């Protein structure tokens, strides 16, 4: 019988899977909401550091959420109450008007993170996943900048 032992998980493998998952998730959101304008993308991680998901904010979702909230709050005394509320809610918690899970895009990286936990690649709560996410987002941002420069 062939040896089926898997290679240990590496930080590089996690970064690669993070990027693939993030790009897959962004494509899925764009396909589901083709006429919407994204203004933010974030990676939400567990405090323990062994799971990750994405969230996307769009101008249109912010508008819908703001309008919905405007109908629920006391009158806002500004020249443009909706604009004031949009400004307040733009960077509110990602549960408010952002597109989030459930989505299977992050399943591959979460399987790797589960293995990383089992293999004790890093300590729980040590910030390693946070650093890997920052590294991945920077690489994605650099790639986006390069793409924009060639257009």
What residues fall within each predicted segment?
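Short N-terminal edge-element motif at the start of the domain
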Residues: 2-38, 42
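Low-complexity intrinsically disordered segments
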Residues: 8, 80-151
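Generic serine detector
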Residues: 16, 20-21, 35, 46, ...
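Soluble, non-membrane globular domain cores that form compact, hydrophobic packing
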Residues: 27, 58, 143-147
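N-terminal interaction modules that seed assembly of large macromolecular complexes
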Residues: 32-71
